[in-house]
Regions:
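Bacterial N-terminal signal peptides that target proteins for export
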Residues: 2-13
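Bacterial N-terminal signal peptides
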Residues: 11-23
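Noncatalytic scaffold domains of N-terminal-nucleophile
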Residues: 27-58, 62, 70-235, 240-242, ...
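Active-site rim segments in enzyme catalytic domains, especially the processed small/beta chain
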Residues: 83-109, 259-261, 398-466, 494, ...
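Short, small/polar residue-rich loop motifs at catalytic or cofactor-binding pockets
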Residues: 272, 383-386, 408, 457-459
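M16/insulysin-pitrilysin zinc metalloprotease superfamily fold
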Residues: 295-310, 464-471, 478-502
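Internal maturation/activation junctions in enzymes
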Residues: 308-405, 418, 425, 433-434, ...
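Extended C-terminal subregions enriched in glycine
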Residues: 319, 453, 485, 493-552
Length: 592
């Protein structure tokens, strides 16, 4: 468990907590959901923010101090992440914002997923031989969907916040103007994508200094992005999707060979969607609906698993059952899930306890089910280059948000004069049925591109609530987001505290390839041997088995905050895997 320090720092700060009343913050371990009979507090003692970058967490804290609520703070955190984590998210991308309004008790998800432009038909992504053009699907203008993140920031401020949008954007505008130190992952990521990014004049203008690429430790300023944010703050939706910024975006896409229309930008809309809700062992789980695949998969896995008391099982059998639930949920993900505005998603059936009970009956508690006995084809993936933040404010409002540009530095294209790095989310569609995408996996008809359609996602911002606790959690990590959130929920149910949950060892199974991926030290030698004896194939760090990814992939960056209603104590956890720097959990009290 991390040790809390009362001293603030900007470097390496990953969770910043604002205490607004005498009760103190604590990272003491969470107890079971019904362990206490103490009175339930009406409101948290303060506010908690957990994000992947110190400056983003600090920006949210600043807005809370200025009188904003969790939704205003979310605007500040999201926009600042767009400035300081360009490898992962930005105004040129999209995301999901799961919201809880404490006053009304209402939960809603803002779907700000990117949409396919009219030009984005399957045929446009095939070469002369009819094969998938991989360069076009992940690089440049053709790989980019119409961005949704700016519209989400406008909606958060207008419908849910209490401060002007311009005020909540002020921290990100300042940081974009004054700059921040380049960290190692930024510099290394640019080096790995340099050939693509330097194809485009607008990108070269931002990332080259005297002809040389950004280097670790130097101050990175983005005046064009600051101007774009300023226009968004001054003019709201029209400041990005119409007028000056829109004209520059359209010109940049056209110059790079793409085809966007002004009406497509002006016509973008955030969708309000009803979250998926279900019960698990005394917890109410609220999570993301389609076009996220996460909520339906979580409902299936947890409702399968509630047939056993996992906390009483040995490591081998517990892991076996969790993996078997993953296997079945990911099989269904492939066949049934897509944008609900275009595809008939059987959500009621897939999230029902009866359906989960039927799946549970197919699990042998002592033997692995070969994936080829569960008919179908592999699941489409998305990349690790995503970010997540979690917020609880002093009124009890909550935000869980996951946002992305898809691959490392998205499409690599910045339309000149905007500072906006465009996403490459078009690769998350099934661009050619039966052909693997950038990650060697397949896609099928439910996720085929159509004008205005939103691509399937694994982003899974989630709330947990019991009589005693309220929790927000989420993580980046591509298709493994869902299983990492699952393991986080199981950790909380087992009584772990927030920091312990964020640091839990992780493993993953996605049906096909039929292999358990695991990070370093996820399994003891005895557990690994026991799983293999049950018939599971393991891909452990150092292995070279085909289809496995071992520890070379990032295993998420989980950010979570927790309110213990009985003790009226807030705590939080920030993932020690965070690639920006070493994870720390720190406190801020009034006057600091």
């Amino acid at each position: 468990m991390s040790t809390f320090s009362p001293r603030l720092s900007l470097r390496g700060l990953l969770l910043l907590a604002l205490v607004l009343a005498p009760p103190v913050w604590s990272a003491d371990g969470a107890k079971s959901a019904a362990a206490s009979t103490a009175p339930v507090a009406a409101h948290p003692p303060g506010a908690a923010i957990a994000s992947g970058h110190a400056l983003a967490t600090d920006a949210g804290l600043q807005i809370l101090r200025e009188g904003g609520n969790a939704f205003d703070a979310a605007v500040a955190v999201s926009s600042t992440l767009a400035v300081v984590e360009p490898i992962s998210s930005g105004l040129g991308g999209g995301g999901f914002f799961l919201l809880h309004d404490a006053k009304t008790g209402k939960d809603v998800m803002l779907d700000a997923r990117e949409t396919a432009p009219e030009s984005a038909t399957e045929a446009q992504f095939l070469d002369k031989k009819g094969e998938l053009d991989r360069d076009r699907s992940v690089n440049g203008a053709w790989s980019a969907g119409i961005p949704g993140l700016p519209a989400a920031l406008v909606e958060l401020a207008a419908k849910h916040g209490r401060l002007p949008l311009k005020q909540s954007l002020a921290p990100s505008i300042r940081i974009a103007t004054e700059g921040f130190p380049v960290y190692a992952r930024m510099a290394k990521g640019y080096a790995s994508r340099r050939e693509v990014m330097e194809r485009y004049p607008g990108t070269r203008q931002v990332y080259l200094r005297g002809g040389k690429p950004i280097a670790e430790g130097e101050i990175f300023k983005q005046p064009e992005l600051a101007h774009t944010l300023q226009l968004l703050g001054d003019k709201g939706f029209d400041g990005f999707y119409k007028g000056e910024t829109a004209k520059k975006l359209l010109a940049g896409v056209k110059q790079a060979g793409g085809q966007w229309k002004a009406a497509e930008l002006a016509g973008y809309r955030v969708k309000e969607r009803t979250p998926i809700q279900f019960d698990y062992r005394g917890w109410k789980i609220t999570t993301a609906p389609p076009p996220s695949s996460g909520g339906i998969a979580l409902a299936a896995m947890l409702q399968i698993l509630e047939g056993w008391d996992l906390n009483k099982l040995d490591d081998v059998h517990r892991t076996h059952l969790v993996v078997e639930s993953m296997r079945r949920a990911y099989r269904d993900r492939t066949f049934f899930l897509g944008d609900p505005d275009f595809v008939d998603v059987p959500q009621r059936v897939l999230t029902s306890k009866d359906y989960a009970q039927g799946l549970r009956a197919t699990i042998n508690p002592d033997k692995a089910t070969p994936s080829d006995l569960l008919s179908g084809n592999p699941t489409p993936l998305e990349d690790d280059e995503t970010t997540h933040f979690s917020i609880i404010d002093g009124e009890g409002n909550r935000v869980g948000a996951t946002q992305t540009v898809n691959l490392l530095y998205g499409s690599g294209l910045i339309p000149k004069g905007t500072g906006v790095l465009l996403n490459n989310e078009m690769d998350d569609f099934a661009l050619k049925p039966g052909t693997p995408n950038a990650f060697g996996v397949m896609g099928y008809a439910a996720n085929a591109p159509k004008p205005g359609k939103r691509m399937l996602s694994s982003m899974t911002p989630t709330f947990m609530e019991s009589a005693d606790k309220a929790i927000v959690l989420g993580t980046p990590g591509g298709s493994r987001i869902i299983t990492m959130v699952l393991l986080g929920i199981l950790g909380y149910d087992a009584g772990l505290d927030a920091q312990a949950v964020s640091a839990l060892p992780r493993y993953h199974h996605q049906w096909l390839p039929d292999v358990i991926d695991a990070e370093t030290d996820a399994f003891s030698p005895q557990t690994a041997k026991g799983l293999e004896a049950m018939g599971h194939a393991l891909k452990l760090p150092g292995d070279t088995a085909e289809g496995g990814r071992g520890s070379s992939h990032v295993w998420g960056n989980l950010q979570t905050v927790e309110w213990d209603k009985r003790s009226n104590v807030l705590s939080g956890g920030s993932d020690p895997r965070n690639p920006v720097g070493k994870a720390q959990v720190q406190l801020a009290t009034p006057g600091q």
